Design a protein with these regions (language model features):
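Protein kinase glycine-rich loop
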Residues: 26-32, 37
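Conserved HxN/HPN-centered segment at the entrance to the catalytic loop
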Residues: 82-92
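Conserved short submotifs of the Hanks-type protein kinase catalytic core
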Residues: 101-117
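Catalytic-loop of the protein kinase fold
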Residues: 166-182
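Activation segment signature within eukaryotic-like protein kinase domains
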Residues: 154-155
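Terminal C-lobe "cap" of eukaryotic-type protein kinase domains
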Residues: 306-330
Length: 379
């Protein structure tokens, strides 16, 4: 499929689903290989709308069914998770207009991060272009540049999300700056549960593929399996990489490392040894960073330890002296009452119910046009 055909297909699916549910398109928030996220309005309320499309291909029915299970697991868990540090999923949909569709579209209405993701935020700080960050100005008393206080401000919240995941027996497996969205009250909220793992006591956790530059060494072991009690330490490794990125505006691994770690001709054992050495070398480099709190340097080095058993656990992070320094003052900045999120949920339910009535009563000409186009790409 050419890029033009792919774009045309995306537009047809988007218009069909927006019209079907009576949502109003606002803008594109992000696009990936299998789906996209849009900003939409439901009456006067703004939400994020994620659409994932799956294609049924000849001879690959098993892969297709596996992908369906994966998407349904992601969406269902996202809807169940209710925490201060998780993006809230309000409603999920599965398009089933055709009995034997070539394409299945899953979509979810989610809380929209009001500002951006953490990677975007860091980008504009390092570029010095704060004009793009006007929404953050009320926080500039504490966040005037990406200094130790700023990094501590974010580190504290990411640790809270780690605590939330562990308490729910979950491992996110994709900890990176772009998966942390900045929402109401300047709260960092974790998103994208596509690689989520459920951790069962005394059962090993099998790791699935992740972004190459955030894969922990245990991804390169022969079995790719870890003990249940160590599962959260995969995310703690990712936390260490996020701290390093905030401090340097660089990923710990570079394109040269990608050539080595992505090379199919190199064995997993060789990749494992290569990454271990790289992490030990980087740890020595971090020790020599100037104008950086010793506590932060120690924290990064501990989190990126090649040996999973030697990384700190969540309890260690919650009690970390550097993280908790002056935390009461920082806490005042992003404190938010739970009623704001409850209000968001109620507003969506109200507007969703109103829309259901509108769909039944409105003129159907436009709806039939998009439905016809949608059926064309199914054949």
């Amino acid at each position: 499929m050419t890029n033009k055909e792919k774009s045309n297909e995306e537009d047809i699916i988007l218009n069909y689903l927006l019209n079907k549910h009576n949502f109003t398109y606002v803008s594109v928030l992000g696009k990936g290989g299998f789906g996209s996220v849009y900003s939409i309005n439901v009456n006067e309320n703004n939400f994020a709308y994620k659409i994932v499309r799956l294609h049924k291909k000849k001879g690959k029915i098993e892969e297709f069914n596996k992908a369906i299970k994966s998407i349904e697991k992601e969406f269902n868990y996202a809807k169940l998770l209710r925490g201060k540090y998780c993006i809230r999923t309000l409603s999920i949909f599965k398009d089933e207009d055709n009995k034997n569709p070539k394409i299945i579209a899953y979509s979810a209405v989610m809380e929209n991060a009001l500002y951006s993701d953490l990677k975007y935020f860091i980008y504009y700080f390092y570029k010095g272009n704060l004009l793009h960050l006007n929404n953050y100005k009320k926080y500039f008393k504490y966040i005037s540049n990406l200094n130790m206080t700023t990094i501590r401000f974010f580190a504290y919240q990411i640790i809270q999300s780690l605590d939330f995941l562990e308490n729910h027996n979950l491992c996110h497996c994709d900890f990176k700056p772009e998966n942390f969205l900045i929402s109401l009250g300047f709260i960092l909220k974790i998103s994208d549960f596509s690689l989520l793992k459920v951790v069962e006591k005394n059962k090993k956790v099998k790791l699935t593929s992740s972004t190459w530059n955030i894969k922990a060494p245990e991804y390169y072991t022969s079995t790719k399996e870890i003990k249940s009690e160590d599962a959260i330490k995969v995310d703690i490794y990712g936390f260490g990489l996020i701290l390093y990125y905030m401090l340097t505006y660089k990923h710990l691994l570079n394109p040269e490392d990608k050539e080595k770690l992505s090379n199919k001709e190199i064995s997993s054992e060789e990749k494992y040894e290569y990454l271990n050495k790289k992490l030990l070398d980087k740890s020595e480099e971090i020790k020599n960073f100037e104008n950086v709190d010793q506590g932060l340097k120690n924290l990064i080095i501990e989190c990126i330890n090649p040996e999973i058993s030697k990384r700190p656990n969540v309890e260690n992070l919650l009690e970390n002296d550097w993280v908790n320094e002056n935390i009461d003052e920082i806490n005042q900045v992003y404190d938010i009452n739970d009623h704001e999120e409850i209000k968001l949920f109620i507003e969506f339910q109200k507007t969703s119910n109103k829309n259901n009535n509108k769909v039944k009563n409105r003129k159907r000409k436009k709806n039939l046009f998009f439905k016809k186009k949608y059926k064309e790409i199914q054949n």
